[in-house]
């Protein structure tokens, strides 16, 4: 892919002629400063997605595979490109490695944009048709999609080694110029250069841009529809649960505590009595908040935030690779163009494209808090505190999940409360009573409880603070 050299490395000539060599060494130093962050940053991305459960979703699995491609660029492509620059673009390695190196170069750059295209398509389907997409959400199916992306990339790049190695041991007419520079010669690979640029970049880029704008449009529409349904504002903390009412004929039953005096849930309140007044009957009727609606709004907010981050990744990738592919097609179609100028532009734009492999981890660090925290822990080797916290959270979550699976919607509150006592759930807070129990004295009470979620909603005008004590 490199069709021009920078300048000869001369060390045994007079001082005035050493300037090109000095400039070349500075360029090599800058290139090394690009290679090292590319390798380190993408290793951090792979570790974060592999180890952090919060980051293990379909989009991030694609990003991890993208990081693998970028990591391989830093390990296999950039160092050899640096060597060719140090040797004045003369290929210093065994000649059969030239088509293999060109194959890896095309493969990884193609895989990068194919991953971004697959991410945009997968996210659009997930937002547009969540029910259908949920059927293909398992890790195995995501890995199958990733394998398909790599397979497509391999199929696009495979003509290079096939055509190059087939002409060995006389590959000079295939991948080497008269200066023994390892390149895709336009007279031999003209059709491949045009076809590869269209299939590997311009067509996926067009699809990706269309899908991205459609995704943003769908998200905005869903947010608008969801917000239009929310016409109630709450001025005090709320704990939202899902209750089943008895039939109208059944009289209200008082809540019976179990033998230990523990209730189903407990809450510790710290109330500022100044300026607080008891809510009226109309205000109490607004104290039921839809947990599902709140969760949907949070989900859409997260999707919008993720779309912005991916939009930045898309934009940077396009800005950094578009000049190379435009120049690449120009070199194949423009016969009268100066080969030296085209070659130098190809060399510069190739390295601009390589830089994009090291920028993605920086984008994740700046715009994603979970990635940023994970990177900080990995760099500082701080695993012990994080592991103990995660184990404690996992133990508490699993304990509560086991109890919730035994709660029956047909059992009474007191019977369900005994499950917490049997599991030795202890806390030292005051008993909690549902806000729905204070609605009206004649209202029906609930005998069956389905603990969907306990949701605390805080507003600016509220001075009352509540804390749910689970363990």
UniProtKB/Swiss-Prot annotation:
Topology in membrane: Multi-pass membrane protein
Keyword entries, A-Z: Behavior, Cell membrane, Disulfide bond, G-protein coupled receptor, Glycoprotein, Lipoprotein, Membrane, Palmitate, Receptor, Synapse, Synaptosome, Transducer, Transmembrane, Transmembrane helix
Keyword Disulfide bond attached: yes
Cytoplasmic side: 50-60, 122-141, 215-308, 367-471
Pfam family, one: 7tm_1
Subcellular location(s) of the protein: Cell membrane; Synapse, Synaptosome
Coiled-coil ranges per UniProt: none
SUPFAM superfamilies attached to this UniProt entry: Family A G protein-coupled receptor-like
Lipid anchor positions (S-palmitoyl cysteine): 381
One Gene Ontology cellular component: dendrite
Record has Membrane as a keyword: yes
Residues in compartment: Extracellular: 1-26, 84-99, 163-191, 330-344
Tissues showing expression: Detected in brain, heart and gut.
GO molecular function per UniProt: Gq/11-coupled serotonin receptor activity; neurotransmitter receptor activity
Domain of life of the organism encoding this protein: Eukaryota
Glycosylation-annotated residues: 12, 173, 179
Sequence positions that bind ergotamine: 105, 110, 184
Primary localization: membrane
Biological-process GO terms, alphabetical: chemical synaptic transmission; embryonic morphogenesis; G protein-coupled receptor signaling pathway, coupled to cyclic nucleotide second messenger; heart development; phospholipase C-activating serotonin receptor signaling pathway; regulation of behavior; release of sequestered calcium ion into cytosol; serotonin receptor signaling pathway
Motif [DE]RFG motif: where in chain: 187-190
Motif (PDZ-binding): 469-471
Residue ranges of the motif DRY motif: 122-124
TM stretches of this protein: 27-49, 61-83, 100-121, 142-162, 192-214, 309-329, 345-366
Family affiliation: Belongs to the G-protein coupled receptor 1 family.
Physiological role: G-protein coupled receptor for 5-hydroxytryptamine (serotonin). Also functions as a receptor for various ergot alkaloid derivatives and psychoactive substances. Ligand binding causes a conformation change that triggers signaling via guanine nucleotide-binding proteins (G proteins) and modulates the activity of downstream effectors.
Protein name: 5-hydroxytryptamine receptor 2B
UniProt organism field: Dichotomyctere fluviatilis
């Amino acid at each position: 892919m490199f069709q021009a050299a920078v300048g000869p490395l001369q060390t045994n000539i007079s001082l005035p002629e050493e300037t090109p060599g000095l400039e070349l060494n500075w360029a090599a130093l800058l290139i090394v400063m690009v290679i090292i962050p590319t390798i380190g940053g993408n290793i951090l991305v792979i570790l974060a997605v592999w180890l952090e459960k919060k980051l293990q979703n379909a989009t991030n699995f694609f990003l991890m595979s993208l990081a693998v491609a970028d990591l391989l660029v830093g390990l296999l492509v950039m160092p050899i490109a640096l060597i060719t620059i140090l040797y004045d673009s003369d290929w210093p390695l065994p000649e059969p490695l030239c088509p293999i190196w060109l194959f890896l170069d095309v493969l990884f750059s193609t895989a990068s944009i194919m991953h971004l295209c697959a991410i945009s398509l997968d996210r659009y389907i997930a937002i547009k048709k969540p029910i259908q997409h949920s059927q293909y959400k398992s890790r195995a199916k995501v890995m199958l999609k990733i394998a398909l992306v790599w397979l497509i990339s391999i199929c696009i790049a495979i003509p290079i080694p096939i055509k190059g190695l087939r002409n060995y041991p006389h590959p000079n007419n295939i991948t080497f110029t008269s200066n023994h520079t390892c390149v895709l010669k336009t007279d031999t690979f003209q059709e491949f250069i045009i076809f590869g640029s269209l299939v590997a970049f311009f067509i996926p880029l067009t699809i990706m841009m269309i899908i991205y704008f459609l995704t943003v449009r769908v998200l905005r529409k869903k947010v608008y529809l969801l917000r239009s349904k929310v016409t109630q504002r709450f001025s005090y903390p709320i704990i939202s649960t899902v209750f089943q009412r008895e039939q109208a004929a059944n009289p209200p039953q008082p809540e019976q505590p179990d033998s230990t005096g523990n209730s189903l849930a407990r809450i510790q309140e710290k109330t500022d009595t100044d300026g607080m007044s008891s809510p009226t009957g109309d205000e109490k009727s607004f104290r039921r908040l839809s947990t599902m609606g709140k969760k949907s709004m949070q989900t859409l907010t997260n999707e919008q935030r993720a779309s912005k981050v991916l939009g930045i990744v898309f934009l940077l990738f396009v800005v950094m690779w578009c000049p190379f592919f435009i120049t690449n097609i120009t070199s194949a179609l423009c016969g009268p163009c100066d080969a030296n100028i085209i070659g130098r532009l190809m060399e510069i734009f190739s390295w601009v494209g390589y830089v994009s492999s090291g920028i993605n981890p920086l984008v994740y660090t700046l715009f994603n808090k979970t990635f940023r925290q994970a990177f900080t822990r990995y760099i500082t080797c701080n695993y012990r505190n994080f592991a103990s916290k995660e184990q404690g959270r996992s133990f508490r979550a699993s304990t509560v999940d086991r109890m919730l699976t035994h709660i029956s919607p047909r059992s009474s509150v007191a019977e369900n409360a005994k499950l917490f006592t049997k599991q030795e759930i202890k806390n030292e807070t005051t008993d909690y009573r549902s806000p729905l129990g204070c609605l009206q004295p004649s209202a029906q009470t609930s005998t069956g409880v389905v603990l969907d979620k306990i949701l605390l909603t805080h507003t600016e005008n509220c001075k009352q603070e509540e804390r749910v004590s689970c363990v």
